[in-house]
A protein has these predicted regions:
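Extended, subdomain-level signal for the structured scaffold at the beginning of enzyme domains
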Residues: 21-139, 147-151, 168, 178-180, ...
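A short beta-strand/loop micro-motif in the catalytic core of glycosyltransferases
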Residues: 139-140, 160
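A conserved active-site-flanking secondary-structure segment within enzyme catalytic domains
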Residues: 155-182
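Short acidic alpha-helix initiation/capping motifs at coil-to-helix transition points
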Residues: 195-199
Length: 237
């Protein structure tokens, strides 16, 4: 075999290894192939509007890029009514935590710190999160939804983030590796967003994991969203 042939063989071999490395994370996310992927967004009184709508809109639009998503909200209230942030409007969910199907992707939006403490004391809702997480392919949080997720104990031993005003509270969980100045963190099947609009970043990252970077970038372009923005605007400590 000549030097040129050896060189080309080496290049193709290295490229094949690189492809496997890029696909390795995808192989860990076993989404259903015989039905739509269930995406459940948990809502409760006082839930933040952009936290809720941002990720939902990403997955709704991803259906135009060969996505196969069944997106729905799940209310913590038995009557399926949820009073959104600021008392601006009522959302009537398709399901409540009493009758919701098993989610493949579970999204937990955030709210004010006061309401975080209130909903975290709702044992039925917190147990529902834990039970759903047993079979989710991905579990995501947005903003202070990371605190709700942390209060279940599911983030223990994981890297995670939350809204920059609530990082100290996240640090009160000593088993969580708190990440600062980042818009989102991916650790295993857990994706945590920093705050409000970062829910869009988290959802786009999920799309990238599932469909590839090109699809996620095209989707962001269609949404007129810069998915490569930074946290440089935060006040320096």
């Amino acid at each position: 075999m000549g030097l040129m042939q050896i060189s080309l063989f080496s290049v193709f071999f290295l490229l094949s290894l690189n492809v496997k490395a890029q696909n390795k994370s995808k192989e860990n996310f076993n989404f259903p192939k015989d039905r739509k992927t269930n995406i459940a967004v948990l809502v409760y009184d006082g839930v933040e509007i952009v936290d809720t709508g941002g990720p939902m809109d990403v997955f709704i639009k991803a259906n135009n890029w060969n996505g196969n998503y069944n997106i729905y909200t799940v209310s913590a209230s038995a009557d399926k009514n949820t009073l959104m942030d600021g008392g601006t409007f009522n959302m009537l969910s398709k399901y409540s935590i009493n009758d919701a199907p098993q989610a493949d992707i579970l999204i937990i939006p955030g709210t004010s710190p006061e309401i975080v403490h209130k909903v975290s004391s709702d044992k039925k809702m917190m147990n529902w999160i834990v039970k759903q997480n047993e079979k989710t392919v991905m579990t995501m949080s947005v903003c202070t939804g990371g605190l709700i997720l942390a209060n279940t104990g599911l983030l223990d031993g994981r890297s995670a983030t939350t809204h920059h005003w609530s990082l100290d509270e996240l640090r009160s969980h000593p088993k969580i590796k708190v990440q600062e100045t980042t818009r989102f963190v991916v650790d295993g099947k857990f994706l945590t967003g920093a705050g409000v609009t970062s829910g869009i970043d988290v959802a786009l990252q999920a799309v990238e994991i599932i469909h590839g970077k090109e699809v996620a970038d095209d989707l962001a372009l269609g949404m007129v969203y810069d998915r490569y923005n930074t946290m440089e605007f935060l006040p320096k400590k």
